[in-house]
Each structure stands twice: as C-alpha cells, then as structure tokens.
UniProtKB/Swiss-Prot annotation:
It holds the Pfam family MgtC. Belongs to the MgtC/SapB family. Disruption phenotype: Deletion of yhiD in addition to mgtA and corA leads to Mg(2+) auxotrophy. Keywords: Cell inner membrane, Cell membrane, Magnesium, Membrane, Transmembrane, Transmembrane helix, Transport. It is found in: Cell inner membrane. InterPro entries: MgtC/SapB/SrpB/YhiD_fam (IPR003416), MgtC_SapB_SrpB_YhiD_N (IPR049177). It is a multi-pass membrane protein. The keyword Protein biosynthesis does not apply. The chain crosses the membrane at residues 1-21, 36-56, 67-87, 92-112, 118-138. The keyword Manganese does not apply. The gene is yhiD. Could be involved in magnesium uptake. One of its GO terms (cellular component) is plasma membrane. It comes from Escherichia coli (strain K12). This is Putative magnesium transporter YhiD.
Length: 215
C-alpha cells in the first residue's frame, strides 16, 4: 500500500509541477516549487484523510468524518491564493495565479484519492486554458500600428528605450539618416486600453521629435 501512496505523490508532483513550470516561464511569483509542494501536500492530506484513520474507525465507539481534513485543504489553499492577489497601478493582478493554485490543490487531492486519470486530465486542461486563453487574450487585447517618426539625429536609441519603459512592444523596420534628422519606421503593439491618439499626442510633444505619422 505504501508503494501505491508513493506513486500518487509522484504523479501529483508531476501533474502539478507542469502547471508550475508554465507559471514560472511567465515569470509569476508562484512557480514550479510552489505548485509541486501544493500538489504533494494536497495529495498527502487526501491520503491521510482517506486511509489514515482506518484503524480508529474500526472501533465501535469511534465515529469520525474522514472528509474533514480534505475539506480543510480547500480552505487553507485559499490563504495561499489570496497572497498572490495584489493591487498594482490601480489594477488587480494575480487572480489567474490564485485560481490555478486552487485548481492545483484540487488536482493533488484527486490524485491523492486514487483517481489518476481525472487528475491528469485536469492538469492537461488547466495547461490548455492557461496557454490557449493567454494567446487568445493577447491577440484580442492588442492592436498593431506602423509608425514613422522624424527625430533629431541621435534620438533613435533613446526613443526605443522609452517605448520599452512604457512596456510597448516595438519592431524596428527601417532607419534613414539625413543631415539634420533621421526617419525611423517601427511597428508597435498597443494594449486595447491604450489610445493611439493619446500616444501620438504624447510623442509629438516630446523633445527631439520633429514629426509623427501612422499607417
């Protein structure tokens, strides 16, 4: 029986670790180790809850609810998830990580109870949701524009650095240098909540910018 429990722990570590690896690759605070530990811990609690009191439950005068320990895992993991939810620049961040921690605990519990296939399917579906919906949201929430900037000579590098500081993705298409100015063609990617009109207005008011056009 012990060997079977060890197998459950290993499967929980693998299934939950895959989710943690995806989170870590995206630079999230809760990464591989956190998810592996949550998955293994949930599996252990489930094993104890299901099998740990077999000798006591066989006694006539003892009545226990073996599901109580497992139920507390759901409550306990909520505190871990809540620690990942932050307010940054008036935006709430960490909700997805908090949700996948909650799901990770559920996967660990499922595998700990012996439902291997359900746990693996749950892990695969979680990875699909995290990856597919990330790509889908990225495509729907971002717009591409082509800008042509006329700058005072020597300002191209500082302008590209400014875009980077604003977290605006840029691709340099061409750079044409003249005697008193340089013409830079770039492709930019803006979040849907950022107004291109506001960006153009801001660029036109910057020192070293002689002209801006969009196509």
């Amino acid at each position: 029986m012990t060997a079977e429990f060890i197998i459950r722990l290993i499967l929980a570590a693998i299934a939950c670790g895959a989710i943690g690896m995806e989170r870590q690759m995206r630079g999230k605070g809760a990464g591989l180790r956190t998810h592996v530990l949550i998955g293994m811990g949930s599996a252990l609690f489930m094993i104890v809850s299901k099998y740990g009191f077999a000798d006591v439950l066989s006694l006539d005068h003892v009545g226990l609810d073996p599901s109580r320990i497992a139920a507390q895992v759901v409550t306990g993991v909520g505190f871990i998830g809540a620690g990942n939810i932050l307010v940054r620049n008036q935006n709430i961040v960490g909700l997805t990580t908090a949700a996948d921690i909650w799901v990770t605990a559920a996967i660990g519990m499922v595998i700990g109870s012996g439902m291997y296939e359900l746990g693996i399917y749950g892990s695969v579906m979680t990875l699909l949701v995290l990856e597919v919906f990330h790509q889908l949201t990225f495509r729907l929430m971002n717009k591409n524009y082509h800008l042509q900037l006329t700058l005072v000579n020597g300002n191209t590098v500082s302008m590209l650095d400014w875009f980077k500081q604003q977290k605006i993705k840029t691709d340099l298409v061409s750079l044409q240098e003249n005697e008193d100015h340089e013409v830079v063609a770039i492709d930019i990617q803006l979040h849907a909540t950022t107004s291109i009109e506001d960006l153009l207005r801001l660029l036109k008011g910057m020192a070293g910018v002689k002209g801006v056009s969009i196509s």
